[in-house]
Amino acid sequence: MKVFRIFIITFSYYLISCNADISKEKNNNQKSFQKVKIYSVPSSFTFAGESIPLDLPDVRERFDKELHVNSYLHSSTILLLKRARRWLPQISEILKSNDIPEDFKYLPVIESGLENAISYKRAVGFWQFLAPTARENGLVVNNEIDERYDPIKSTYAAVKYLKKANKKFDNWVSSAASYNRGVRGIENSMKSQKVNDFFSLYLNKETTRYIYRILAVKAIFEDPSKYGFNLDSLDYYYPEKLKEYKITRSIPNLTNWSLTNGSNYKELKRYNPWLRKNSLTLRKNKNYIIYLPNR
């Protein structure tokens, strides 16, 4: 009987302890849940100087969705912010000097994450050009050279595309949408639906989301701390010091060439990803710039 009483007392203490732990864990979970921040859609917002009609319920809700998706996509958004410090100043300068609104710098952010990505459709580079479109806009794409992998040259190609698109639509939001759907795709949708602006169009999910992702990235990048991203200056990636080599004649072996110039093939490929083979054959009166670390 005494043994049974001891068992009951011990078991009771165990249950009390378990309940206390469960209650403590529940309170901790509730506190953690309460720390999740809800972000408000701005009262007004623009893209490329054009007002976004946030009074429309679907526009507001789609923007709200992308704000939260991208705010809580922590690792990806942090890396985008880090890379942006290296690339967006250069991209912005090219856009502005060619009369393209600076907000278009956010297109390569969502297109490729500011990396030389390759899509399942074989779109390549920061600006995700397909080979035919790249050639149409002045890029060299062949067996040895693929300038879609050159962030600077491909930005100039994007400028050409966007100028043609805006000449067609006279609207920068629609021009941005055409970068995803194609000029003809947006134009056909406008004709069939008898409207002439993006926010009145019923479009495929990908293109619709594309614009709102751009808006969300712009909001976050313009005020990262507001959305929970607090990076110190040392956290960012910055442009590296590089030395230019003007190439005026063919190079039969790029590995040997890089070693001769105090570098190696790995560094050559890092700073010149547009070189697709171990050789560079120049046509008459053609030259290129190759970059290597400036030691």
What role is predicted for each listed range?
Residues K205-G228:
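Catalytic cores of secreted or luminal carbohydrate-active enzymes
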Residues D232-G262, K286:
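Primarily a LysM-type cell-wall glycan-binding module
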Residues Y271-R295:
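Extracellular LysM carbohydrate-binding repeats and other cell-envelope/extracellular binding modules
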